Amino acid sequence: MERQFEIVSAYSPQGDQPVAIEKLVEGINSGKKKQVLLGATGTGKTFTISNVIKEVQKPTLVMAHNKTLAGQLYSELKDFFPNNAVEYFVSYYDYYQPEAYVPQTDTFIEKDAQINDEIDKLRHSATSALFERDDVIIVASVSCIYGLGSPEEYRELVVSLRVGMEKDRNQLLRELVDVQYGRNDIDFKRGTFRVRGDVVEIFPASLDEHCIRIEFFGDEIDRIREVNALTGEVLAERDHVAIFPASHFVTREEKMKVAIENIEKELEERLKELNDNGKLLEAQRIEQRTRYDLEMMREMGFCSGIENYSRHLTLRPAGATPYTLLDYFPEDFLIVMDESHVSVPQVRAMYNGDQARKQVLVDHGFRLPSALDNRPLTFDEFEEKTNQVIYVSATPGPYELEQSPEVIEQIIRPTGLLDPPIDIRPIEGQIDDLLGEIQDRIAKNERVLITTLTKKMSEDLTDYLKDVGIKVNYLHSEVKTLERIEIIRDLRLGKFDVLVGINLLREGLDIPEVSLVAILDADKEGFLRSERSLIQTIGRAARNENGRVIMYADRITRSMGIAIEETKRRRSIQEAYNEEHGITPKTIQKGVRDVIRATTAAEEPETYEATPAKKMTKKEREKTIAKMEAEMKEAAKALDFERAAELRDLLLELKAEG
């Protein structure tokens, strides 16, 4: 029976959500390729998109512009669709340093990476879900446009097993090795199998606690069970099971032979070219590196950096479009680009950055020219692969507006909150004026955000406010994600009342306690004072019923004019709706713990660091290490990778000191 998308929520669509849902669904059903949802801050865009997915019943790819945002969307969508496959597909590197060469200093930087096992599992879970069911939503970062193995090969190499099927046990073991599973009878983990007489246990790459137990009777599969890998408890009897490859870069043996021949051919051509041009060092370098890789591929079926040979492994011609996650979706699927004003330019930029770095490696003999084909999609290729797209943003960019002139608006907030009124005040005397406004807000137990243009001005203003007795903090680019979360939490808790920063547009700054946003130097045109940036900044005051924005400027620039008019337009729509329906705006009541998933991040490292490792007894140190390791794994499971990375660093320090 085909599974359907179904939303589980205590809420029903409110305000202009029903109209937005209806228009988007109508557009998709009538075959529109591109649509724009202009959703003001706090209007419930994710809920609207969830309802659209439920209505159109199509597999959906939701693209976010960074891992943090992808994690937030994944959590929200998982809550709305608990009975469907909501998957997470982001880069699986906790830390990634691509290989690079700096000719000026003759420095080669080896690729260095730490793969997060949990994310790797989630990636496998995402791709296998697409082949097993239709009710799939994958939340991905923009890195999903990077090359992945061939979906046909991935599908064809699935090991399909049924009860009663005739199959020799050793044949199954060979098939598992072909799809990159390793035999390990002692350390049984993801991507391995173990053998005990007539029983084969397989730990699929997409699971983290369950394994599949295959029991043979002679040359026949007698029984298939799903088992807890740790306790051995039988969880379910299965009639059929599909074991997906343990790597996205899998290749059949016969294809591997052809690929190796083609790589050797390319190497010979490249060596001739380099030697003819007198580049003897480069020629020696490329020969040594490539021959080593070829030997590994012959013996082991893979090598480090095998993705650089992906063009040969998939037998594609030079310059051909690489396979990506988009190719794993069926033809009729939906893409939702969240915060499209940032995501779209990011997709555009990825190809050029990647090619510039790889070209240097090719020129200096570190890689064969075919490595240039292991790349992200160009923007045109991305466009070709998309079926139907919804661009979602509070401030859609020029590209989205050009592609879909008819914009679907979602302006009304379910809470009745209005876009804030805007005052324009002269720059002369701005600090004294601002001080008076801050004191008014402090008296009402409300908070203030101030955005400046330069680091120096932020620092000077912070120092001045501290000198006059204001509790203030300063947010800048060097503040790590975890500290940033802690600062936002302290602002909400009232440990300080004013937050000063340059770019206050990043996610996580929707703080209901903020009733004043002050924009200094609002008339200095630039990317931080463009119409989009100004509208986004103004939105920071739209979570509080007393929200207000003050722009300090001596003239009204074009960007200011557009932002002010747009805010007024939205406010009048919201006021009319509230009046008609008798709604009184109410500040969002949001528990402080809701702002961040890692609230403990602010507290717990202090308890860990309170006793220096040197003063701990051996037992205390072991206990602390065990506790931290458990918490690190929990944080990674909860997709709170910043917290997990911080704990990893603390653990390394603790072990080093011990």
UniProtKB/Swiss-Prot annotation:
Residues 622-657 form the UVR domain. Residues 26-413 form the Helicase ATP-binding domain. The lineage of its organism: Bacteria, Bacillati, Bacillota, Bacilli, Bacillales. The gene is uvrB. The keyword DNA repair applies. Transmembrane segments: none annotated. This is UvrABC system protein B. GO terms for molecular function: ATP binding; ATP hydrolysis activity; DNA binding; excinuclease ABC activity. It comes from the Bacteria. InterPro entries: Helicase/UvrB_N, Helicase_ATP-bd, Helicase_C-like, P-loop_NTPase, UVR_dom, UVR_dom_sf, UvrB, UvrB_inter. The keyword Cytoplasm applies.
